[in-house]
Amino acid sequence: MSHPVPALTYADCWKYHGRQAFWLTRHVSYRIGAVLALLASRLGLTPATLTLLSFITGVGGAFVVASFPQMPEAVAGLFLLVALHLSYGLDCADGVLARATRTTSPSGALLDKIADLLGSMLIPGILGIAAFGRQTSWADDLWHAFLVWWSMTPRLALTTITWIKEGMTPGIDRKGADDTREHTLFWKLKKFAGNLQDDVIYRTGVAVSWACGHYWDFILVFQGFCCLLLVVYLITSYLEIAASEKQK
C-alpha cells in the first residue's frame, strides 16, 4: 500500500538552497527561491517550468522597458528591479524544487544553463539597444555596437569560464566548505571581489542605474570590473589546476 507523499514546507525547500552560492544570492535570492519553489510544488509546477518562467520573466521585463520608451525612467527602473529579481528568484527555485522533490536530471541542468546563458545575452542586449537616446548622453556619441557588446561580454565570459572550470575540475571546490586553500589576504580579496559581481548586485545595479538615467555609467564600471576579475580568475585558475596536477 503506497503512502501519500507529504507536502513540502518552506524548511524543506530552504534545506536544498545552493550552499556554494555567493553571500547575497544565498541569503536573498535563495530565500525568494525557497518561497517560489514551495508555491510551485503546491501548484504542481515542474522545475523545467520554473526555468522557462525565469527566462521569460527576465527577457520579457527587458523587452517591455525597451518597447515603451515613453515610460518614465523611474517607473522603468522599478519595473526592472521587480522583473529581474523575480527572474533570478525563479532561477534559484528550479534547482531547489528539483532537489526537494528528487527530480534532478542532466536534461534539467542543461536547460537551466542554456536559459541562463541566453538570458545573460538577451537582457543586456535588449536594454543596451533601448538605452541609446534614453540614458547617459555621452554613450550616444560612441560606437553603439561596441557598447552593446561590452554590456554583455565580460561578465558572460567570466560566468561561462567558471562553469567550464567547475565541470572539468569538480574536485577543486570554488566556494564551499571543503575549500582547503589557505585563507590569505589575497584569497579574502578575491572572495570579496567575487561577491561584488554577484547577480543580486548586478541586477539591482541595472535597475537603479536605469531609474537614475546612468545605465551606461554603471555598465562601463561594472563590466570593466568583471573584465579585471576575468583576467585574475584565468591566471589563478591555471596556477591552481597546475598545482593540483603536480600533486597527483
Where would I find each of the regions flagged by the language model?
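A feature for the membrane-embedded catalytic helix bundles of lipid/isoprenoid biosynthetic enzymes
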Residues: 2-37, 113-248
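Membrane interfacial helix-start motif at the N-side
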Residues: 37-48, 107-108, 190-193
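Alpha-helical transmembrane segments of multipass membrane proteins
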Residues: 39, 59-67, 204-208
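Membrane-embedded alpha-helical segments that form the functional core of polytopic membrane enzymes
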Residues: 47-107, 124, 219
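Membrane-interface alpha-helices at helix entry/exit sites of multi-pass transporters
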Residues: 106-114
